[in-house]
Amino acid sequence: MTLSFTARWRDELPATYTALLPTPLKNARLIWYNDKLAQQLAIPASLFDATNGAGVWGGETLLPGMSPVAQVYSGHQFGVWAGQLGDGRGILLGEQLLADGSTLDWHLKGAGLTPYSRMGDGRAVLRSTIRESLASEAMHYLGIPTTRALSIVASDTPVQRETQETGAMLMRLAQSHMRFGHFEHFYYRREPEKVQQLADFAIRHYWPQWQDVAEKYALWFEEVAARTGRLIAEWQTVGFAHGVMNTDNMSILGLTIDYGPFGFLDDYDPGFIGNHSDHQGRYRFDNQPSVALWNLQRLAQTLTPFIEIDALNRALDRYQDALLTHYGQRMRQKLGFFTEQKDDNALLNELFSLMAREGSDYTRTFRMLSHTEQQSASSPLRDTFIDRAAFDAWFDHYRARLRTEAVDDALRQQQMQRVNPAIVLRNWLAQRAIDAAEQGDMAELHRLHEVLRQPFTDRDDDYASRPPEWGKRLEVSCSS
């Protein structure tokens, strides 16, 4: 089957990019590809044949129909206007046309210098490409909207970061790479007609049902806000901290995008800061809902030339509603509740307080809770707490709450185990795969990808364990 590519972005938004070709790496070689995703997209196996070199995965060749561009956008970084940014090392190669008429961006990260590289070198390093590939696939299999990873190419090209590393490329796929920052770019350049063109593009291709509706722009922004609210709710329920929620890292489609200094909670710490460059804690775990709203407010400002203020405020309210509704639903599922009752939030907050005091492992606590038997007065979770009396008091309240619903253990446990993962991508697991890969051993990278495809399956090996001492509080930065 021949892959078909279109160039909608290039054809319809000429002011938003620079056309250019990728710059290949030295001795580039394909070290991993996403076989399941490749099969779903009907990508010929021959394209992954190592005897053909790095090929399209390393920017050495293009597939018919590809028209590479680097996109320009701007944004607020750490709450401060940063001006023009753009694809400083990534190139949108083309948009794959799928059987249902939708498209999928093929974006090559680490593809070399672009007009938007600023002081950068246009490269990505092996460490960061491995982290992004693992994170995006882990989030996908957790059921959270995200970009996808299709391939990783390693090389012998030296790249200087805090230390000297080697260059790599990641093929990232997404329904769209449209960001809040695209709109900010033209708003602050005082080109509102181009802001409106971006909105028209989004509606035409992703919300076509509203094209002929009078209030199409207000409806569109309301949906952007709602998607953002649902996304942040999903992050909070699995204990995911993005680490660098700048406006240029926010997706119009409500996707998790740009995995840098992210981290999943080990110990439950609502103030967890994954990014060691975030000295003020702006992007700490418990501040993510507020930051997302702030980012939406920045996007709303760019839309004021063609959306009424009242409509924008209604959309921002929709964000709050979507966030709280989705978060509440998901947390009730994690606790095994099938109905909503007035004391549910208090019961959850009591558990969180207990976990915070004890430094309980976030993922393991909820997974162990999902094995609770309603009639049993004891729980294996009890042994993980030092203050047994406090746990017993909470557990008595919890069991009493379970008894208010006519649901048997098997059905409740089944629901809980579908939403409480046994495995998340802990930073130490990613680091172990990176350390091996940097020595030329890709086995752990491949193994970890396989493990992350089944996050809701119990395991008795270290993939489901708490981190070892060396793996606690690993420092992660924006350097990539």
Curated annotation (Swiss-Prot):
Keyword field: ATP-binding, Magnesium, Manganese, Metal-binding, Nucleotide-binding, Nucleotidyltransferase, Transferase
Active site per the UniProt annotation: D248 (proton acceptor)
Binding site for ATP: G86, G88, R89, K109, D121, G122, R172, R179, D258
Entry superkingdom: Bacteria
GO MF annotations, alphabetized: AMPylase activity; ATP binding; magnesium ion binding
Residues holding Mg(2+): N249, D258
Entry cofactors: Mg(2+); Mn(2+)
Record's catalysed reaction(s): L-seryl-[protein] + ATP = 3-O-(5'-adenylyl)-L-seryl-[protein] + diphosphate; L-threonyl-[protein] + ATP = 3-O-(5'-adenylyl)-L-threonyl-[protein] + diphosphate; L-tyrosyl-[protein] + ATP = O-(5'-adenylyl)-L-tyrosyl-[protein] + diphosphate; L-histidyl-[protein] + UTP = N(tele)-(5'-uridylyl)-L-histidyl-[protein] + diphosphate
Primary role: Nucleotidyltransferase involved in the post-translational modification of proteins. It can catalyze the addition of adenosine monophosphate (AMP) or uridine monophosphate (UMP) to a protein, resulting in modifications known as AMPylation and UMPylation.
Descriptive protein name: Protein nucleotidyltransferase YdiU
Organism the protein comes from: Salmonella newport (strain SL254)
